[in-house]
């Protein structure tokens, strides 16, 4: 559960309505893979990840980034039940994919950076604080099934 004020919730959802999920998702996942290269081991089937340009131009990275942000959108619609919303994804990433749950926090922080880059002055410090709460809540929900 994420505790947002009514004003924060309105602001987060208003900004999210302007997000180009295709572009932002690909950029966020791509940046994660470039900035934290050890995360690439989970994406070996994606082909060429040999350089920042290869990662950022990789169509599989872009497609998966879009998928990730689609799930994030679902989370925004269910802020009062993030653990339930992400239960199956948590189980998948824990039991089958064996993803380090710290990677969820890293991706959330990268997403905040990408939103700031894309929205400039509209992404105020207050907006950042609200989004940090959301990405922390999503990361916590995704890590829920880990033992």
Swiss-Prot record:
<keyword id="KW-0479">Metal-binding</keyword>
<dbReference type="GO" id="GO:0031838">
    <property type="term" value="C:haptoglobin-hemoglobin complex"/>
</dbReference>
<feature type="modified residue" description="Phosphoserine">
    <location>
        <position position="51"/>
    </location>
</feature>
<dbReference type="GO" id="GO:0072562">
    <property type="term" value="C:blood microparticle"/>
</dbReference>
<dbReference type="GO" id="GO:0020037">
    <property type="term" value="F:heme binding"/>
</dbReference>
<dbReference type="GO" id="GO:0031721">
    <property type="term" value="F:hemoglobin alpha binding"/>
</dbReference>
<dbReference type="InterPro" id="IPR000971">
    <property type="entry name" value="Globin"/>
</dbReference>
<keyword id="KW-0349">Heme</keyword>
<keyword id="KW-0561">Oxygen transport</keyword>
<comment type="function">
    <text>Involved in oxygen transport from the lung to the various peripheral tissues.</text>
</comment>
<dbReference type="GO" id="GO:0019825">
    <property type="term" value="F:oxygen binding"/>
</dbReference>
<feature type="binding site" description="distal binding residue">
    <location>
        <position position="64"/>
    </location>
    <ligand>
        <name>heme b</name>
    </ligand>
</feature>
<dbReference type="GO" id="GO:0015670">
    <property type="term" value="P:carbon dioxide transport"/>
</dbReference>
<comment type="subunit">
    <text>Heterotetramer of two alpha chains and two delta chains in adult hemoglobin A2 (HbA2). HbA2 represents less than 3.5% of adult hemoglobin.</text>
</comment>
<dbReference type="GO" id="GO:0046872">
    <property type="term" value="F:metal ion binding"/>
</dbReference>
<keyword id="KW-0597">Phosphoprotein</keyword>
<dbReference type="InterPro" id="IPR002337">
    <property type="entry name" value="Hemoglobin_b"/>
</dbReference>
<dbReference type="GO" id="GO:0005829">
    <property type="term" value="C:cytosol"/>
</dbReference>
<comment type="similarity">
    <text>Belongs to the globin family.</text>
</comment>
<dbReference type="GO" id="GO:0015671">
    <property type="term" value="P:oxygen transport"/>
</dbReference>
<dbReference type="InterPro" id="IPR012292">
    <property type="entry name" value="Globin/Proto"/>
</dbReference>
<keyword id="KW-0813">Transport</keyword>
<keyword id="KW-0007">Acetylation</keyword>
<dbReference type="GO" id="GO:0005344">
    <property type="term" value="F:oxygen carrier activity"/>
</dbReference>
<dbReference type="InterPro" id="IPR050056">
    <property type="entry name" value="Hemoglobin_oxygen_transport"/>
</dbReference>
<dbReference type="GO" id="GO:0005833">
    <property type="term" value="C:hemoglobin complex"/>
</dbReference>
<feature type="modified residue" description="N-acetylalanine; in variant Niigata">
    <location>
        <position position="2"/>
    </location>
</feature>
<feature type="domain" description="Globin">
    <location>
        <begin position="3"/>
        <end position="147"/>
    </location>
</feature>
<dbReference type="Pfam" id="PF00042">
    <property type="entry name" value="Globin"/>
</dbReference>
<feature type="binding site" description="proximal binding residue">
    <location>
        <position position="93"/>
    </location>
    <ligand>
        <name>heme b</name>
    </ligand>
</feature>
<keyword id="KW-0408">Iron</keyword>
<dbReference type="InterPro" id="IPR009050">
    <property type="entry name" value="Globin-like_sf"/>
</dbReference>
<dbReference type="GO" id="GO:0042744">
    <property type="term" value="P:hydrogen peroxide catabolic process"/>
</dbReference>
<protein>
    <recommendedName>
        <fullName>Hemoglobin subunit delta</fullName>
    </recommendedName>
</protein>
<dbReference type="GO" id="GO:0098869">
    <property type="term" value="P:cellular oxidant detoxification"/>
</dbReference>
């Amino acid at each position: 559960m994420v505790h947002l004020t009514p004003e924060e919730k309105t602001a987060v959802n208003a900004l999210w309505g302007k997000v180009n999920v295709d572009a932002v998702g690909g950029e966020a996942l791509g940046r994660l893979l470039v900035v934290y290269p050890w995360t690439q081991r989970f994406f070996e089937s994606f082909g060429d990840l040999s350089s920042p340009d290869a990662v950022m131009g990789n169509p599989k990275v872009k497609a998966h980034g879009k998928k990730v942000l689609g799930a994030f959108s679902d989370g925004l619609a269910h802020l009062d039940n993030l653990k339930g919303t992400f239960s199956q994804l948590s189980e998948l990433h824990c039991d089958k994919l064996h993803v380090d749950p710290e990677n969820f926090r890293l991706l959330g922080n990268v997403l905040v950076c990408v939103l700031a880059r894309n929205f400039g002055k509209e992404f105020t410090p207050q907006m950042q604080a609200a989004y940090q709460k959301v990405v922390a809540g999503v990361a916590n929900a995704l890590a829920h099934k880990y033992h």
